[in-house]
Design a protein with these regions (language model features):
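Conserved catalytic alpha/beta core of Sir2/sirtuin-type deacylases, generalized to analogous enzyme cores
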Residues: 1-232
């Protein structure tokens, strides 16, 4: 990533009163977790289940039509990718760069990494749920109430900061993930001084919103290292 872009991103984040993060599978992949491929991590962590159940990737196991297979994979996934998760350098850097501001996360990732990395769980909207839901009695009892409360909190934050500096980080959100992209574009459109920053491999496209845009096509991990080096 060009140093000039790193400086612009660092300035946008440092000056922001509100930072809204949208994250999808690309962020997980940048951390080394790929739900779609039988890579080394898959065989090391799920190899026994894969051989027993005839499964070729994590997502296939989690979405198996066999309820028993789904349960086994969800339990292993929750244990390995949430309970035993240690925040990656990328996630730690993301936290450091955003912790000074009001931060809100919208993610379709089901591993709960943001919560484990220290982000406020009441400001982490998981659009496709999480393996944590199987052991969270509040979510089991009131699955929609928490999401509604989180949406209200996002609306409150946007209203409070609509005339201030707002930074939007779109992290590895594919073109087909319309839910997250629409929500981020709505935030950008509602805020007077928004900077929309997109990180993606070969799909770093400007949002449907009229605001300053910075596009980064490439690996997120070294990009965030470069941004962090710009911070005094």
């Amino acid at each position: 990533m060009e140093t000039a872009k790193a400086v612009r991103i660092d300035r946008a984040l440092a000056e922001a009163n509100l930072i809204v993060i949208g994250a999808s599978n690309g962020l997980d992949m940048a951390e080394g977790l790929n739900l779609f491929r039988a890579d080394d991590h898959f065989w090391e962590t799920y190899g026994d289940l894969a051989q027993a159940d005839g499964i070729g990737c994590i997502l296939q196991g989690l979405s198996s039509p066999d309820a028993n297979v789904r349960r086994r994979w969800a339990e292993r996934f929750h244990q390995k990718e949430h309970l035993e998760y240690e925040p990656s350098p990328l996630m730690n850097t993301l936290r450091r760069l955003t912790e000074h501001a009001d931060a809100f996360v919208i993610t379709c990732n089901i591993d709960g990494h943001f919560a484990r990395a220290g982000f406020d769980v009441n400001r982490v909207l998981e659009t496709e749920g999480s393996t944590r839901t199987s052991i969270d009695e509040r979510r089991l009892a009131h699955p929609d109430a928490l999401a509604a409360a989180q949406l209200e909190e996002l609306a409150r934050l946007v209203q409070a900061h609509r005339n201030g500096r707002v930074a939007i980080l779109e992290l590895g959100v594919g073109l087909r993930n319309g839910v997250i992209k629409r929500m981020l574009a709505q935030v950008a459109s509602a805020c007077e001084h928004a900077t929309y920053i997109v990180f993606n491999y070969s799909q770093a496209m400007a949002p449907d919103a009229s605001c300053e845009t910075i596009l980064i096509d490439g690996d997120m991990a070294p990009a965030f290292e470069e941004i962090a080096r710009c911070r005094p």
